[in-house]
Swiss-Prot record:
Keyword rRNA-binding: no
Role this protein plays: Multidrug exporter. Is implicated for the resistance to bacteriocidal quaternary ammonium compounds.
Keywords for the protein's UniProt record, in alphabetical order: Cell membrane, Membrane, Plasmid, Transmembrane, Transmembrane helix, Transport
InterPro entries in UniProt: Small_drug/metabolite_transptr, Small_multidrug_res
Membrane topology label: Multi-pass membrane protein
Localization in the cell: Cell membrane
Name of this protein: Quaternary ammonium compound-resistance protein QacE
A Pfam cross-reference name: Multi_Drug_Res
GN (gene name): qacE
Length: 110
């Protein structure tokens, strides 16, 4: 259970860091650049803890899949990124894949 909590923390850290990348303007703005560095540091530290209890393939699939969906949603909602019906279908498939991997696949057993 602790592994999944750590994975959520890793995903949140990665999402915050990636969201701040645009504001850092190529690491020329100090505050957003610090958020990027700290966020990625938190993300990778907690991902390393996750790997003690969750298989790397499962952890990385959940981390990257949900990260992509959340980042895309943030860009769509806050930054006006265009997202058509196929974009929503693709994100739905990513989430579906993560659910299948975790609920139905034996790969998630440790």
């Amino acid at each position: 259970m602790k592994g999944w909590l750590f994975l959520v923390i890793a995903i949140v850290g990665e999402v915050i860091a990636t969201s701040a990348l645009k504001s850092s303007e190529g690491f020329t703005k100090l505050a957003p650049s610090a958020v990027v560095i700290i966020g990625y540091g938190i993300a990778f530290y907690f991902l390393s803890l996750v790997l003690k209890s969750i298989p790397v393939g499962v952890a990385y699939a959940v981390w990257s899949g949900l990260g992509v969906v959340i980042i895309t949603a943030i860009a769509w909602l806050l930054h006006g990124q265009k997202l058509d019906a196929w974009g929503f279908v693709g994100m739905g498939l990513i989430v579906s894949g993560v659910v299948v991997l975790n609920l139905l696949s034996k790969a998630s057993a440790h």
